[in-house]
Amino acid sequence: MPKELNGWLDEVVKAAKKRKAVIKSRERNLYDIKDSIVKKKEKKLNPIIAEFKRRSPSGLKQDRDPLEYAKLMERFGAAALSILTEPLYFSGSYETFEAISRNVKLPLLFKDFVVTEAQVDTAYSIGADAVLLIVKILKDNELCFLYDYIKSYGMVPLVEVENEKDLNTADACGAEMIGINARDLNSLNVNVDRVAALLKIAPLKSIKVAESGIQDRSQILRLLESGADAFLIGTALMKDPQKIKLLI
């Protein structure tokens, strides 16, 4: 069983455990998100993981055509796409993810509150190349089990952390790709300074992704100096997709 949680996180996780798996033959090749990030860095570009989400608990309400957005991000040079599939608070769906997966050739991150094997099975079936795991909502043994389960499909786990304790937990599971979230999932407050501090002590061997709160190039440059390898950006790009050209 996942950790005991409160508020909206508890509601989301309880609902996630009840969602039915979508099991079908995968139609899409696997695209390596780590390789995509490395190639962008080799070209002296900022690797951007552009996120599609219609809504968020922090107040975002932005309805865009998902295919138009995904194709635009691909054309403008995103390293990967992150797609919210959580329905209650983010208005996400498996159908939107699968539609995007059929129309772009970028690595796709399955962004949800993953607590069951069924969700991982679904992610693979609908075309995911990477799957988010959130340390905050999983017990240590659950995290490591799901980490290995994701890898068994050939997908990449992105392990999300909020603090130094989370970092140590992620490292103990062998995390090769770590996301450092500026947003506290309880309060929803954003602190980009915390990301910069955690980047400096994150395992050198891992690919480090700065998540949440990134609005401009100056923030990216500061996070690069702290050790970030890639940047997951949602709200800023959902509001203005053209902004990616200023951030890459």
Question: PLM features: residue spans?
Answer:
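Short secondary-structure transition/capping segments
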Residues: K3, I126-I137, P157-K165, N181-L185, ...
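Glycine-rich phosphate-binding active-site loops on the catalytic face of alpha/beta enzymes
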Residues: I83, S125-E142, G179-L188, A228-L246
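Short catalytic-loop micro-motif centered on adjacent basic/acidic residues
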Residues: S82-I83, L109-F110, L132-L133, P157, ...
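Glycine-enriched alpha-helix->loop->beta-strand junction motifs that scaffold or abut catalytic
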Residues: G77-A78, N103-L106, S125-V131, K151-M155, ...
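Alpha-helical elements of the RecA-like P-loop NTPase motor core of helicases
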Residues: D121, N168, L221
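Conserved N-terminal beta1-alpha1 strand-loop-helix module at the mouth
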Residues: M1-L108, V115-E117, Y149, M155-E176, ...
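Catalytic-face loop-and-helix region of soluble metabolic enzyme cores
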Residues: M177-S226
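Hydrophobic, well-structured mid-protein blocks that either form specific transmembrane helices
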Residues: I100-K151
